[in-house]
Curated annotation (Swiss-Prot):
PROSITE patterns: RIBOSOMAL_L11. GO terms for molecular function: large ribosomal subunit rRNA binding; structural constituent of ribosome. This is Large ribosomal subunit protein uL11c. Pfam families: Ribosomal_L11 (PF00298), Ribosomal_L11_N (PF03946). Part of the ribosomal stalk of the 50S ribosomal subunit. Interacts with L10 and the large rRNA to form the base of the stalk. L10 forms an elongated spine to which L12 dimers bind in a sequential fashion forming a multimeric L10(L12)X complex.
Amino acid sequence: MAKKVTGIVKLALNAGKATPAPPVGPALGQHGVNIVMFCKEYNARTADKTGLVIPVEISVYEDRSFSFILKTPPASVLIVKAAGLNKGSGEPNIKKIGSITTKQLESIAETKLPDLNTNNLSQAMKIVGGTAKNMGILIED
């Protein structure tokens, strides 16, 4: 018989740098999960992706065990990294702060495809392109 899920916790953590300190400790502590064990497993599975924010969905079972699924990094993080910036524009409709090429947009869309609600690459490019536009980043051919 399958274990009964008692809670689902969603967190966005820096790859390879999860610690029992907030936000991980309080979020998992209230479900009775072994926080140190989660941090070790998360850091081991994300060691090759340092510098990125990797969202994780943790399923907590009634025997206080857990399993987790790693998601793809947020589109905004990938766009900022591709553009070589620290953050998006504070006024995206007025001040454009950088640009990415169509090829970079396509590679970001391919990365994000498993987590988007489409299987079509051109649709994924439109979704990611909209995120870039809302960050004040232009898309060049």
